[in-house]
């Protein structure tokens, strides 16, 4: 689902996806993420202190949402992951029957068996995630978003 692209190009793609998500009740109807099940994760920049919004694929685990810091199998973690480590209270926007639901959540990093179970669940739905792990020597972090409703 991701590939090597310059950072500015990804920023442009993210901005377009965020705009489409918000204008079409959480649906993505065009572009490279057409039809993808995404949420918007709002973090506070670890260095800048500015809000950052990233569209991310997700799965559910009970009441929680699960996102993966794959960065397409890159050798480095995505910036949003560093933001989560520095500031684990995040904002989430996700499609719901009545439109887009917004809530705050606490982000925690899954470890051990839980991490593997959640990663495997995402890879079962989106096989690209299995390929991402093969492309890198780093353990790709799995983040559990625990809603604060």
Residue map of PLM features:
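Extreme N-terminal tail/first-helix region
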Residues: 1-34
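Short, structured beta-strand-loop surface elements
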Residues: 4-5, 71-129, 135-139, 147
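Short coil/turn segments at secondary-structure boundaries
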Residues: 32-36, 133-137
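Short beta-strand segments
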Residues: 36-70
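Short hydrophobic/aromatic beta-strand or adjacent loop that forms the aromatic wall/cage
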Residues: 38, 139-142
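Short beta-strand element of the conserved SAM-dependent methyltransferase core
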Residues: 41, 143-147
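Short loop segments at secondary-structure junctions
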Residues: 63, 148-149
């Amino acid at each position: 689902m991701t590939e090597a692209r310059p950072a500015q190009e990804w920023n442009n793609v993210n901005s377009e996806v965020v705009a489409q998500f918000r204008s079409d009740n959480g649906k993505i109807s065009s572009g490279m993420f057409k039809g993808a099940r995404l949420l918007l994760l709002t973090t506070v920049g670890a260095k800048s202190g500015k809000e950052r919004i990233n569209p991310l694929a997700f799965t559910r685990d009970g009441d929680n949402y699960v996102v993966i810091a794959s960065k397409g199998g890159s050798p480095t973690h995505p910036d949003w992951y560093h933001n989560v480590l520095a500031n684990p209270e995040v904002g989430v926007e996700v499609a719901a029957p009545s439109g887009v639901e917004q809530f705050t959540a606490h982000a925690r990093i899954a470890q051990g068996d839980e991490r593997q179970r959640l990663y495997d669940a995402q890879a079962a739905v989106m096989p690209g995630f299995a390929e991402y792990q093969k492309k890198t020597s780093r353990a790709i972090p799995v983040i559990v978003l625990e809603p604060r409703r």
